[in-house]
């Protein structure tokens, strides 16, 4: 105990975060039926993922084996709705504008319904004119999150569960990693999605924050 209270681990947030913009986002989204939102983002994986916790006899350290060579990153582009995970695309390496446009035009846009709102962060590839036009041709809209606000998108929590499942799978080849990602995506349920929506401030009608 310190004179000013307990000594706790700090929760760090980006100093560039603009609270006025975040408040405006809350005002904009609060009247919207959460079922209209389609959250789209990317996450990276590799062939050296391993569980971060393990059991060991009392007084001994838990140890595990993991490859030091992670290989090239595998990127997953995916969407989350109240029904769970939507269209997904696996890429070798990172995401550039052409890759993201290919995902949107080939997978995401055909799945959209008129009136849906695709929510994206501010990655440069997300702002490509071809992305917005493909979304709007389906009668949907593209909205962009406030900068430095991963806490406002429930797909971040979906990716957290996905990574936990991949750590448990322990894939050590690219093919094994791809094979592990598919069932991990299916393991994300509508109940998961609704919980994450509510946690991020988008509760379904009738559910209080």
Each predicted region: which residue ranges?
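Short functional hotspots at interaction and active-site rims
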Residues: 1-209
């Amino acid at each position: 105990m310190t004179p000013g209270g307990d000594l706790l681990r700090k929760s760090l947030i980006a100093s560039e975060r603009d609270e006025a913009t975040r408040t405006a986002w809350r005002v904009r989204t609060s009247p919207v039926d959460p079922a209209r939102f389609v959250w789209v983002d990317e996450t990276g994986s590799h062939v050296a993922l391993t569980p971060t916790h393990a059991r060991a006899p009392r007084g001994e350290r838990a140890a595990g084996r993991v490859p030091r060579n992670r290989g090239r990153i595998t990127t997953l582009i995916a969407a989350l709705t109240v029904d769970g995970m939507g269209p997904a695309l696996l890429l070798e390496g990172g995401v550039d504008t052409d890759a993201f446009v290919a995902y949107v035009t080939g997978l995401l846009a055909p799945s959209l319904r008129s009136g849906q709102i695709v929510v994206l962060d501010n990655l440069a590839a997300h702002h490509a004119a071809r992305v917005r036009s493909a979304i709007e041709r389906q009668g949907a809209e593209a909205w962009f999150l406030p900068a430095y606000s991963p806490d406002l998108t429930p797909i971040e929590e979906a990716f957290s569960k996905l990574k936990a499942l991949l750590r448990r799978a322990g894939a050590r080849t690219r093919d094994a990693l791809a094979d592990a990602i598919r069932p991990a995506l299916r393991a994300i349920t509508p109940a998961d999605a609704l919980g994450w929506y509510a946690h991020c401030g988008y509760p379904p009608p009738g559910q209080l924050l």
